[in-house]
Amino acid sequence: MPHIDIKCFPRELDEQQKAALAADITDVIIRHLNSKDSSISIALQQIQPESWQAIWDAEIAPQMEALIKKPGYSM
């Protein structure tokens, strides 16, 4: 705890880039939430652009009030 679930359009990330992303996010979570490294998990799911509406409908729009960073777009 915490678990971070990143969804994005497909990116060409190799394992080294994924590890660097995870390390950077982990450092931020440790600094701001006072978490232990061993408590943090991070998922990276690459979603095709034509499938993004489903993510918006299920995960973004219903939680708009809870988002600490709101998107600059709407669907």
Swiss-Prot record:
GO MF, one annotated term: intramolecular oxidoreductase activity, interconverting keto- and enol-groups
Tell me the disulfide pairings in this chain.
none
Q: What is the lineage of its organism?
A: Bacteria, Pseudomonadati, Pseudomonadota, Gammaproteobacteria, Enterobacterales
Q: Which GO terms describe its cellular component?
A: cytoplasm
Record's subcellular location: Cytoplasm
Q: What is this protein called?
A: Tautomerase PptA
Q: What residues make up the catalytic site? A: P2 (proton acceptor)
Q: Which organism is it from?
A: Escherichia coli O139:H28 (strain E24377A / ETEC)
Q: Which family does it belong to?
A: Belongs to the 4-oxalocrotonate tautomerase family. PptA subfamily.
